[in-house]
Amino acid sequence: MTFLSPPEIPTIKADNGTYYDFNNGARILFPKGEWHVNIIDEESGNILFSCDTKAGWVTSTKKYYVKFRIQAFKKGDEKPFLDTVMELKDKPVLISFPTGTLGDIIAWFHYAEKFRIKHQCKLECSVSEEFITLLSDNYPDIKFTSAQDKYEGKPYATYRIGLFFNGDTDNQPVDFRLVGFHRNAGYILGVSPQEDPPRLNLSAERKIQEPYVCIAVQSTAQAKHWNNGLGWAEVVRYLKELGYRVLCIDRNAHAGNGFVWNHIPWGAEDFTGALPLQERVDLLRHASFFVGLSSGLSWLAWASRIPVVLISGFSRPDSEFYTPWRVFNSHGCNGCWDNTNYNFDHTDFLWCPVHKGTDRQFECTRLITGKQVCGVIRTLHSYLTNHDRII
């Protein structure tokens, strides 16, 4: 994941030619001389770092939200010439999000709004252009900046929201695999990890009169797919028997890597394409429900406030947003994404850390049968029927 870089020089000038700020942790830049510095967690009083130094940088190891206190002394002095506690109220703060992901940003963004409300700061968020289009009108108190542009701002503090692997607890206070990847944003920012969908424009008029269900069958790794060879065909057939049109809304009708490719299910209507996210929301908003994977379009459906049938074994049931229509099979190997013994390999499309190359590869979703998913759909359909919510 790539993020905006902090300013080359800290943004606040102190006495004695010293500069400091809180961009990607506490940062202090000293001129020539003999100095002593303390970096303190103000909430606990713990001294996180204390050292003598000459000209150069002192930076905190921890980059997530900590209420830092910085004390800087001329070496030998008892009284600091700089003694400041980080205070974000009315200060310019940047939250930098990575690009190239859909579900991650949908999952994380409302934590930024919680942060703004908590601290009453002047918040700026760096996201890709497609998310500026999707979100900016619904968050008028946040300034949006394109992550693709060169950044020349001078914020007081910067935070980076992402997934940090290999047990990294410098950029996140806890390993994201222990708390669910979306809640990780709450922990990084020091706000409640309770999940909340972002605010979207849900005002589009309905264009398809018949009841319909949206599905999405593609994802970024084969482990995230539903690897039951007959599953999607059974689900599409069953949905049509219930009277729904079935619209496949993946970006691509066919996607894969090397010798493994996944295709739009037989019988589904092809609504695939690289469409603006708002157009996807406009279609999802009026669907009776969505059936998908541990992938970005499931998150977009959740944010569109419709029921989501989520099929996954690669991740554990609390790894994504809560849905009563989660489909998970505990009878085989499962949950490798959330297992701290394994580090996900983004370069290996066929990553399966325990059973790759054996007949048990991807059994986490292969053992989820069409019967099991159709059973969940039957329960959801009955609920919608009984509450007069078939739309």
UniProtKB/Swiss-Prot annotation:
Major localization listed first in the record, in broad terms: cytoplasm
Family: Belongs to the glycosyltransferase 9 family.
Native source organism of the sequence: Escherichia coli
Disruption phenotype: Loss of bacteria adhesion to human HeLa cells. Reduces glycosylation of AIDA-I.
Catalytic residues of the enzyme: D104 (proton acceptor)
PANTHER family, A to Z: TETRAACYLDISACCHARIDE 4'-KINASE-RELATED
Residues binding ADP-D-glycero-beta-D-manno-heptose, per UniProt: T101, L102, G103, Q218, T220, K224, R251, L275, G296, E320
Classification via Gene3D superfamilies: Glycogen Phosphorylase B (3.40.50.2000)
Residues noted as binding Fe(3+) in the record, renumbered to the chain: C333, C336, C352, C364
Cofactor binding comment, as recorded: Binds 1 Fe(3+) cation per subunit.
Assembly, per entry: Homododecamer composed of 6 homodimers forming a ring.
Annotated consequence of substituting S294P: Loss of the ability to use ADP- L, D-heptose as a sugar donor
Sample GO molecular function, one term: ADP-heptose-lipopolysaccharide heptosyltransferase activity
Function summary: Glycosylates autotransporter AIDA-I. Catalyzes the addition of both L, D-heptose and D, D-heptose sugars. Probably by glycosylating AIDA-I, involved in bacteria adhesion to host mammalian cells.
Keywords of this entry: Cytoplasm, Glycosyltransferase, Iron, Metal-binding, Plasmid, Transferase
Reactions this protein catalyses: ADP-D-glycero-beta-D-manno-heptose + L-seryl-[protein] = O-(D-glycero-alpha-D-manno-heptosyl)-L-seryl-[protein] + ADP + H(+); ADP-L-glycero-beta-D-manno-heptose + L-seryl-[protein] = O-(L-glycero-alpha-D-manno-heptosyl)-L-seryl-[protein] + ADP + H(+)
Keyword presence, DNA repair: no
InterPro entries reported for this sequence: Aah/TibC-like (IPR030929), Glyco_trans_9 (IPR002201), LPS_LOS_Heptosyltrfase (IPR051199), TibC/BAHTCr-like_N (IPR049327)
UniProt-recorded name of the protein: Autotransporter heptosyltransferase Aah
EC numbers: 2.4.99.-
